[in-house]
Structures are given as structure tokens and as C-alpha cells.
């Protein structure tokens, strides 16, 4: 093989379609609710996109940022399909792709990855999932997880991609690789549909509850693989449910000082991880929890302590604590100030969070009590 590695045309088309869909939602101020957990994945279409001049500029700028093409000259002069945009992009050298961190607060941070690194990761995954006949994408390809698993991987395996949602999921078939986030898998588990043999599920973008994974396997899903990584690093390790350990991809190595649980890349550079980890052996790690105390809702980082502080600013609230619930959304426990009507206070809180917090930050359930939940040792405890 000679020359630099190149992005497959099919991958360029899928990434382009997803970036255009995301940018048009932003420009048109559409409410996408739970983002990656609820959005409709962009589909390639043969119909020209109805863009005005400002939308054309916005789409060109967004694509230029992702594909690192600095000017807007690749923007078509006439109404064009997403495939037309992709074809223009493909005529130029693409050495890196830029992806963005997810977060409900703060500005998403860009992270550039070389095409060589992205393709190396996708080829390694292709070897591990070589029996795949079709990729079913419940996530778009405008973030690193979706880009690798639903754009690069199927292009390398030369298999079709079916994009959809939980409600429009095609009938699963042997050889399917279904790519989603924990909220998708929770919804599929609730639907209770039977799984045919030889269907593999992939999950990332948040913690996959152990009970959920076990329920899906018990219902007949052949494999469920939890992916650990970040927008900064790409995939770091894979965990076969119900195991607790993540097997490192070949790019990553544990340092000899195992007690510090430090990872280095193939160049020997240490990697800053969002989680504390514990080595199980030379190639497997266990996650011990986020260092920044963030949790993920729909693949987006949110911060329960910050949200609890905001709830504490609501009139009638003495103190509050926020946790991630079993259903993948946030829940709040409230200690009222005085003895207010709890139903009225809950209504007030829902109006308050709608005005102050992003959709993914808003607790969907509220419990009330005279004091915050604690265990017999006096430490913060969960509640039902």
C-alpha cells in the first residue's frame, strides 16, 4: 500500500450528511430534545437541499471545520444534495477530521484526529466484528463514536448502513451490528421484541447499567459491547457484557507503574482520562468513576452537583441533590424550606428548570423529604 490513507467515499458521504443535518437544526433553531438519544439520524437523499444563502454559508463553514478545509469554495453554486457536497469535499486532500466534545454547559471543544489514526482504529474494529453484514445506526456520524462505527467501519467492511431511530428500527437480522447509546438500549429493552441469532449491540456515550445489559442478553441479544473512550482519544477499550473489564485497543498500553493506572499511546505519551481506572491485568481495566463527577445523559456530559446548586436557588428549596436515575435521566431529591405543598413546589421546580437548565440537565423526577438521603454511615445515599 502506497501513499497516505484516504477516507472511503461512502464514509465522506455519511459524515457530510450528518454534519449538514446538525448545522441545519442549529440554524433553524429546532428543538432536538435529548440530542443523540432522541434525534433522527440524517439520511442521504437524492432531493436537493432547500438552503438559503445564509444556510449555505453555515453548512459550508460547518463542513469546512470538520474536514479542515479552510475556505467555502467547495459550496455548490446551485441547489445540491448532500452527496453533491460530499463529492466536492472528496476532491480535496483530507488529512484530519475535527470532532467536538459533548456538553450541556460550556462551549464544545474541538479535537482533531489524523485520518491514519481514525482508519487504524476502524480497521482494528473491523477485524473484531468481521462477521457483520449490516450496520444499523441509531446515532449520527457527526461525533467520533458515530463517525467510527457508522461511517468508517461499514465502509471498511463493505456492508450497508441503515439509519433510523428506536421506533423505526428495521427488523433485526442475523449479522446486524446495532450502534446506539444506553438510552436506545433501555428503550429497546422496554419494547421487549425478540432478537434473532447473531445480532450484536454496541453502546457508548454513557454508563451502561449492568442490569440493562444482563436483561438484553437474557432476551436473546447475542452480544452487547460497551465502548469506553472520548472525543479526545477515540475508543480506548471494549467490554463484553456482563464482564466488568475493558480490553484495551492495540494503540493503548498500561504503564509499568500499575498502581497509578496510567495509559500511554503508541508514541509513549501519557493520556489524560476522564475516569479513574484500575488495572485488572496488562490489557484490561476497570472504570472507577468520573474524575469531574459528570454523568452522561443522551451522550452529553452533565454535572449533577452544579444542577443541584441551581435547584437550591429556587424559592422554597432548602437543599437538593441530583443523581442519574435508572432510566437514563436525572432525578432530584428536594428538602423543602418550611412546609409547602409538594405538588405546587414540584410544578414550580419544573418551570424553574425549564427556564434555567438545558433539556438534558433537567431532572425528570422529584422526590421530597425532611433531609437528604444518607446511609447508616452518614454518607450520601441513593433513593427510590
Please place each PLM-identified region on the residue numbering.
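Conserved S/T- and glycine-rich ATP-binding loop of Class I adenylate-forming
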Residues: 63, 101-104, 135, 178, ...
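Conserved C-terminal "lid"/linker of ANL adenylate-forming enzymes
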Residues: 295, 352-384
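AMP-binding/adenylate-forming
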Residues: 112-125, 134-188, 200
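AMP-binding/adenylate-forming catalytic core of the ANL superfamily
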Residues: 275-361
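Conserved adenylation A10 loop of the ANL superfamily
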Residues: 98-110, 231-232
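Phosphopantetheine-dependent thiolation modules in NRPS/PKS and related acyl-activating systems
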Residues: 1-97, 379-384
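Gly/Ser/Thr-rich phosphate-binding loop
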Residues: 190-243
Amino acid at each position: 500500500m502506497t501513499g497516505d490513507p484516504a477516507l472511503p467515499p461512502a464514509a465522506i458521504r455519511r459524515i457530510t450528511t450528518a454534519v449538514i443535518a446538525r448545522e441545519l437544526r442549529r440554524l433553524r433553531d429546532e428543538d432536538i430534545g435529548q440530542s443523540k438519544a432522541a434525534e433522527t439520524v440524517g439520511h442521504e437523499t437524492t432531493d436537493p437541499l432547500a438552503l438559503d444563502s445564509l444556510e449555505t454559508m453555515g453548512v459550508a463553514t460547518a463542513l469546512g471545520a470538520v474536514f479542515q478545509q479552510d475556505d467555502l469554495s467547495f459550496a455548490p453554486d446551485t441547489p445540491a444534495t448532500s452527496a453533491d457536497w460530499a463529492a466536492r469535499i472528496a476532491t480535496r486532500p483530507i488529512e484530519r477530521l475535527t470532532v467536538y466534545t459533548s456538553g450541556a454547559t460550556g462551549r464544545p471543544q474541538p479535537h482533531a484526529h489524523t485520518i491514519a489514526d481514525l482508519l487504524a482504529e476502524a480497521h482494528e474494529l473491523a477485524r473484531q466484528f468481521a462477521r457483520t453484514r449490516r450496520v444499523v445506526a441509531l446515532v449520527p456520524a457527526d461525533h467520533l463514536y458515530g463517525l467510527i462505527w457508522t461511517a468508517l467501519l461499514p465502509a471498511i467492511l463493505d456492508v450497508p448502513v441503515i439509519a433510523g431511530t428506536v421506533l423505526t428500527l428495521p427488523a433485526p437480522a442475523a449479522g446486524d451490528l446495532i450502534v446506539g447509546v444506553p438510552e436506545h438500549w433501555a428503550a429497546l429493552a422496554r419494547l421487549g421484541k425478540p432478537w434473532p441469532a447473531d445480532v450484536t449491540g454496541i453502546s457508548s456515550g454513557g454508563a451502561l447499567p449492568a442490569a440493562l445489559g444482563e436483561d438484553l442478553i437474557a432476551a436473546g441479544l447475542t452480544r452487547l459491547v460497551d465502548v469506553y473512550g472520548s472525543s479526545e482519544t477515540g475508543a480506548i477499550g471494549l467490554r463484553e457484557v456482563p464482564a466488568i473489564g475493558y480490553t484495551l485497543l492495540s494503540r493503548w498500553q498500561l504503564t509499568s507503574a500499575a498502581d497509578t493506572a496510567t495509559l500511554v499511546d503508541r508514541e509513549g505519551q501519557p493520556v489524560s482520562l476522564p475516569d479513574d481506572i484500575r488495572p485488572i491485568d496488562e490489557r484490561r481495566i476497570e472504570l472507577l468513576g468520573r474524575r469531574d463527577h459528570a454523568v452522561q445523559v443522551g451522550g452529553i456530559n452533565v454535572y449533577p452537583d452544579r444542577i443541584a446548586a441551581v435547584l437550591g436557588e429556587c424559592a422554597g428549596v432548602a437543599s437538593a441533590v441530583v443523581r442519574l436515575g435508572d432510566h437514563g435521566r436525572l432525578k432530584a431529591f428536594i428538602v423543602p424550606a418550611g412546609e409547602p405543598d409538594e405538588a405546587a413546589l414540584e410544578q414550580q421546580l419544573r418551570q424553574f428548570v425549564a427556564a434555567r437548565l438545558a433539556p438534558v440537565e433537567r431532572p425528570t423526577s422529584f422526590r421530597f423529604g425532611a433531609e437528604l438521603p444518607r446511609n447508616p454511615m452518614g454518607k450520601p445515599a441513593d433513593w427510590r
